[in-house]
UniProtKB/Swiss-Prot annotation:
GO terms for molecular function: aminoacyl-tRNA deacylase activity; ATP binding; leucine-tRNA ligase activity. GO terms for biological process: leucyl-tRNA aminoacylation. Keywords: Aminoacyl-tRNA synthetase, ATP-binding, Cytoplasm, Ligase, Nucleotide-binding, Protein biosynthesis. A motif ('HIGH' region) lies at residues 51-61. It is found in: Cytoplasm. ATP binds at residue 650. Belongs to the class-I aminoacyl-tRNA synthetase family. Its EC number is 6.1.1.4. This is Leucine--tRNA ligase. A motif ('KMSKS' region) lies at residues 647-651. The gene is leuS. It catalyses: tRNA(Leu) + L-leucine + ATP = L-leucyl-tRNA(Leu) + AMP + diphosphate. GO terms for cellular component: cytoplasm.
Length: 955
């Protein structure tokens, strides 16, 4: 077993999956069957979020990419002209950081890339430049895609550091700025002090989902050491200021007394003026943070927290003085290190005061009325839960969470809140914050939503107000309306993620779009900045449509903005553009046709981590730049991947490189398993034993194909079991079609395993018609070919067909072979046999004779009545049944039977007697005894029979 946990071979006595994989990949490449260009067919355009090349492609990529790959192959079978291609993301700082770490021979990085990413040491030590890393991992990613048999149009491949791609991004940013969507100013951003850059989700080692949280700093005042001071309290709930009885400091930590100056940026300049803002007392960590957020801090002295105890500070709203008390629960890494005490509503505050014996001294001030609570909610819930003291963290968290939730949704401010009385808690924050800021009794401070936010370089990130920073103004309400309109018009798989996108749009704020370091496109109107990696990856799907023309040899100089303006928007004079770009008019017109043919994008596929950034940005940028008819049509979201329960990690493992999976199991096994092991948007846990099981079952289909070709075809009439297998197979055509259309690929796997079981049952029931088996294999080879194309190509060839199954049409349903009664009949036999086994087991007998009794006619009449009635609720259907005389006379027995029928499921009545008679020989052989259907009613057993549940007597 290697560092990634792989311990499985690909060999099998009857088939070599790797040899088959090699064979068909070579044939596909030579035939160029996946190259797509516009024609008269309906198009289908699908893409996935391209991978970032700071490592090999891993199991997480495999799931995200195999889903659209499977759908692309299916859509080709539906006679769609499918465009499915890939690019590589290399811009930003992670690759730069990795190159530096390799150059510095960081032990953990060297170990990870040698052992987890499988880079030989002699090759690894050469990856000390961004260019070397991009070259290495782009080759490995290309190889991985090809080894998995992805049906890509490789003519359209590109990297985001290509000079020609940069010209496309320059056009995008010129357009956004022209529309007023790009602005320059000061804004708080996630920032790496070491890299000297704003950082985005992809730049982070920890805290990828962290957001910037806005705290209100409430300016309490006092006198300390002979000076008037401000002691700011950070809070997310400014309304609680009306209920403050005390404040908390950590007696064991260090604070500072410092002069604070506000930095006010000069108009049209990055220079600042300083405005005195008083002497503040805050925690040391807070002082460091404030320095980065538009303030200059000059420290006068350091103070131990214990020195502040006994100090009284004035509430700026109520004007009441409150004491400072000690509290170890005050975290210095959040806020100012000084916390307001609101014991009537905060369980932590109440229990801390109770532990100190200070409740009577300071009292409780209620400020929020909540339905279902008394005057002092914190006291009530602490006593109800039995919280012992401040160390009872679990119960305190539970209490806090419940109160805050109830206050937010059901609470309103009481008379202690003056002019704000009667306003609901959920509506007050914005108004209060605005009023406090205008009155100069509060300021704003920014914190991360998570404490551990670490750049890939290893440095702890901060929130920094960057001056002269370029932003995309995603906060624009009119722009958000268009984004919402787009989301409403789109398809989502699964559907329930639609609301999450609406929520992300509502929460969207302005975003830094450029940085000083890293790989990428220079900001065309300010070349001191480089466009960051989540801003150059929002509309590249449009670039795919014309990339094959560009990759034929067009130069960056030829890709003038007017070219993109015409190709994507239809603006401009094509003759002038041809003259200015030195690109033929015919080529430009072909580029325009190709874009118009393939756009809009039908489906965008990604893992769920890209919902709050890339995917939402994609929607914003499309609605800004493109006509409505070219807005994206659909987004598919899959969950994460774990390996034997362990979370994937590029630095610690496991990684499970895609190429390693292909070589150990074969591409088809990996494709089948990763697409069918979990439904959207659930996470998938890769289990190698289950992969081996999938491999074995796929090989059974191959072996069946070989056997049906080796045996002579029979010409006998179809038996009932033949008809049953054909019914099941042709029913699968529609089921698989629905599964593919709705991205429910796990159902394909379940249907395949059902096929394996059906084939076992068919053989067990005496099925041996080779013509039937060949027809079943042909259909299922087509149904599975989007998932397991190599194996299906091989089977197709074994069946005697020429050409590629990859170019075959989806199988058509033969409606004359669909007969639900056959399926119900076989399920009836299986159920009856299971009941027989259970009775044998309980009675511990081996019968010589067995009686099977079917239900009385009136019971079938009741089944039909229930089947035809739309009402499926027991209580509702009983009155309807009892109106019928033929049922009413059976009294209580009817009530019992209705419940029994509901348990087994309301189905149509079938010819049970005929079915049992036809299966009698089979049942006799299974149980080695004589079977009698509806013979003498021995010991009155027949009355116990109900539809689909024959009564059984053995002797």
């Amino acid at each position: 077993m290697d560092q990634n946990g792989v311990n499985a071979g690909n060999g099998h006595k009857s088939i070599d999956l790797i040899q088959i994989m090699d064979k068909w990949q070579k044939k596909w490449t030579e035939a160029k069957i996946f190259e797509a260009e516009h024609d008269l067919r309906d198009k289908f355009f699908i893409t996935a979020a391209f991978p970032y090349l700071n490592g090999v492609l891993h199991a997480g990529h495999l799931r995200t990419f195999t889903i659209p790959e499977t759908i692309a192959r299916y859509q080709r079978m539906k006679n769609k002209n499918v465009l499915w291609t890939f690019g590589f993301h290399v811009t930003g700082t992670p690759i730069l950081g990795l190159a530096n770490q390799i150059k510095e021979r960081k032990e953990d990085i060297i170990w990870a890339y040698n052992n987890l990413h499988n880079i030989p040491m002699d090759e690894l030590i050469k990856l000390d430049t961004p260019e070397a890393i991009v070259e290495c991992f782009s080759k490995k990613a290309t190889e991985a895609f090809k080894r998995m048999g992805f049906s890509l149009d490789w003519r359209r491949n590109f990297k985001t550091d290509d000079k020609v791609f940069s010209k496309f991004i320059e056009w995008q940013f010129y357009k956004l700025k022209e529309m007023g969507h790009i602005t320059k100013g000061s804004h708080p951003v996630r920032y790496c002090p070491k890299c000297e850059n704003p950082v985005e989700d992809h730049d982070l080692l920890h805290g990828e989902e962290s957001t910037t949280v806005e705290y209100s700093l409430i300016k309490f005042t006092s006198e300390f050491d002979g000076k008037e001071i401000i002691m700011p309290m950070a809070t997310l709930r400014p309304e609680t200021l009306f209920g403050v009885t005390n404040a908390w400091v950590n007696p064991n930590e260090m604070y500072v007394m410092a002069e604070v100056y506000d930095e006010i940026q000069k108009l049209d300049s990055e220079d600042v003026d300083l405005k005195y803002n008083g002497i503040w007392i805050v925690g040391k960590e807070c002082a460091d943070k404030l320095k980065e957020q538009d303030r200059k801090i000059e420290i006068l002295k350091e103070i131990k927290g214990s020195e502040l105890l006994g100090l009284k500070i004035k509430n700026p709203v109520t004007k009441k003085e409150v004491p400072l008390f000690p509290a170890d629960f005050v975290e210095m890494g959040i806020g100012t290190g000084c916390v307001m005490g609101v014991p009537a509503h905060a369980p932590y505050d109440y229990i801390a005061l109770r532990d100190l014996g200070k409740i009577e001294e300071v009292g409780l001030i209620p400020l929020i009325e909540i339905e279902g609570y008394d005057k002092f909610p914190a006291k009530e819930i602490v006593e109800k839960l039995g919280v012992k003291d401040q160390n009872d963290d679990e119960l305190l968290e539970q209490a806090t969470s419940k109160i805050y939730k109830d206050e937010f949704h059901k609470g309103k401010l009481n008379e202690n809140c003056g002019e704000y009385a009667g306003i609901s808690v959920k509506d007050i924050k914005e108004k209060l914050t605005k009023d406090y800021l205008n009155s100069n009794i509060a300021e704003i401070m920014y914190e991360f939503s998570e404490q551990k936010v670490v750049c890939r370089c290893g440095e702890k990130c901060i929130i920094k107000t960057v001056k002269g920073q370029w932003f995309i103004n995603y906060s624009d309400e009119n722009w958000k309306k268009l984004a919402h309109e787009c989301i409403d018009s789109m398809n989502f798989a699964p559907e329930n993620i639609r609301q999450e996108f609406h929520n992300k749009v509502d929460w969207m704020k302005d975003k830094a779009c450029a940085r000083k370091k890293g790989l990428g496109t220079l900001l065309p109107f300010d070349e001191n900045w480089i466009i960051e990696s989540l801003s150059d990856s929002t509309i590249y799907m449009a670039y795919y449509t014309i990339a094959r023309f560009i990759n034929e040899g067009l130069t960056p100089e030829q890709l003038v903005p007017e070219l993109f303006e015409y190709v994507f928007l239809g603006n401009g004079n094509v003759e002038e553009i041809a003259k200015n770009s030195n690109i033929s008019k015919e080529t430009i017109e072909e580029m325009r046709k190709e874009f118009l043919y393939y756009y809009p994008l039908d489906w965008r596929c990604s893992a769920k981590d890209l919902i709050p950034n890339h995917l939402t940005f994609m929607i914003f940028n499309h609605v800004a730049l493109f006509k409505k008819e070219h807005w994206p049509r659909g987004i598919e979201i899959n969950g994460y991947v774990t390996i034997e329960g362990k979370k994937l990690s590029k630095s610690k493992g496991p990684v499970l490189p895609v190429s390693e999976v292909a070589e150990n199991f074969g591409a088809d096994v990996a494709r089948f398993y990763i697409t069918t092991c979990a439904e959207l948007p659930q996470d998938a846990d890769v289990k190698f034993k289950e992969m081996e099981k999938a491999r074995d079952n796929l090989i059974k289909l191959y072996e069946l194909a070989v056997s049906v070709m080796e045996e002579e075809s029979t010409q006998k009439e179809f038996s009932l079991i033949d008809k049953w297998l054909l019914h099941k197979t042709y029913s699968s055509i529609k089921g698989a079609e629905t599964a593919y259309e709705e991205f429910q690929l796990r159902k394909i796997g379940l249907m395949f395993y059902e096929l394996i079981n059906d084939l076992r049952w068919y053989k067990r029931r005496g099925g041996e018609n080779n013509n039937v088996l060949k027809e079943v294999v042909e259909i299922w080879t087509k149904l599975l070919s989007p998932v397991t194309p190599h194996l299906c190509e091989e089977i197709w060839e074994k069946l005697g067909y020429s050409g590629f199954i990859s170019q075959e049409m989806y199988p058509e349903i033969k409606s004359e072979l669909i007969n639900e009664d056959l399926e119900l009949g076989e399920e009836f036999i299986k159920s009856a046999m299971e009941d027989i086994r259970n009775i044998k087991g309980v009675a511990k007998i081996n019968p010589e004779k067995m009686y099977l009794y079917t239900a009385d006619d009136w019971k079938y009449d009741l089944l039909e009545f229930m089947n035809e009635n739309s009402e499926k609720n027991v209580k509702a259907i009983i009155p309807l049944v009892m109106k019928e005389d033929k049922f009413k006379r059976h009294g209580k027995e009817v009530m019992k039977l209705i419940n029994e029928i509901m348990k087994i499921g309301v189905k149509k009545a079938i010819a049970e007697v005929e079915i049992l008679e036809n299966a009698k020989t089979f049942i006799e052989s299974e149980f080695d005894c004589e079977v009698i259907v509806n013979g003498e009613d021995v010991k009155g057993k027949k009355k116990f029979a109900i539809p689909y549940k024959p009564a059984i007597y053995m002797e």
